[in-house]
């Protein structure tokens, strides 16, 4: 199985010849995972993905396999709520209330989109001047500097693909890391100091 450990953002992929490149259709949850096994569209095989953690793939991004093969990412249609408002102020107010609930939010000039949630729809109905419509659409929220949402610990990407993820991870991490020990053993590692007992170190995730 080929492994893709990097990708090209859609804005930089304009000069690539993708006429024969296979595609892979992914939901937002899948596009946020860094390590997984992918089934290519139209039965064109499988691809292992092991990109840098914290990345979110977008529609039109291009995965690059180790042998140089390109695979075009396509965003799947998802169950979303599209919010419109009578005035820009009312739309901004809706965005404020959704943001307070840590909702992954796609912000467009004339509307907002979020993963459909009936409770949030009821909340918006109480604001006045706001309309929420349920539909199937591509969902590409602005994850911003925070990475988006409440994702803690490892990506939810291992499961049945644990063996692939481990192999891909070790291949990705094979390059040496600079780690200076100049000045003796006085360096400090994040998450623990050397003044305590070594048996009490927290396991790094």
UniProtKB/Swiss-Prot annotation:
Pfam entry (one): UreE_N
Residue ranges with Basic residues bias: 177-196
Lineage: Bacteria, Pseudomonadati, Pseudomonadota, Betaproteobacteria, Burkholderiales
Full protein name: Urease accessory protein UreE
GO molecular function list: nickel cation binding; unfolded protein binding
Intracellular or extracellular location(s): Cytoplasm
Protein family according to the UniProt entry: Belongs to the UreE family.
InterPro entries: UreE, UreE_C_dom, UreE_N, UreE_N_sf
Domain of life: Bacteria
Assigned keywords, A-Z: Chaperone, Cytoplasm, Nickel, Nickel insertion
Record gene name: ureE
GO CC aspect terms: cytoplasm
Keyword Lipid metabolism in record: no
Purpose: Involved in urease metallocenter assembly. Binds nickel. Probably functions as a nickel donor during metallocenter assembly.
HAMAP family: UreE
Example of a GO biological process term: protein folding
Disordered: annotated span: 171-205
Xref: NCBIfam families: PRK13263.1
Keyword Cell cycle: no
